[in-house]
């Protein structure tokens, strides 16, 4: 979407909004989402820019038309979901909230996905371990949730250095794991993850082992 198109769309919808605490011209949640095919996206002009991994994730999420984003802050994931919060406020995510803790996060995002909305969450290291109980059912149910995991050592005592221990856990859950090595991957993988997970999702229609 061009800046001119975005501005025009904002001007056409903001007059209907009256939300206390929001500045004049605030765009409703999700109002700037636009459906575009993969072929059309590939034809758009491209440029090379320098950005952090969290900023790359933000640009990927902006293009993903996310319906629900739920997370609980944990270093170093907090900045990424903060960026998602900005996208919600700008109108690129329909609904966003911070859960009470990690098990609550994974339970809530599972419910959202099972209800049929495009769902995004993120966590890191110890947070993933705390939420593991709730996400264990995702692969068997084939829920198309996209979870961004920022690799961090599983700490005792406290440590925040990078590590791949939680990836080892995820590889044995049955979940599809896309491992990003740079900012370009962190832009590409979330978009690919949504397309792949929704393509292979067979919610409630999987044949039983006897079929």
Kindly give the residue locations of the regions a language model identified:
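Conserved thiamine diphosphate
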Residues: 161-203
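Conserved small/polar residues in nucleotide/adenosyl-binding loops
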Residues: 204-211
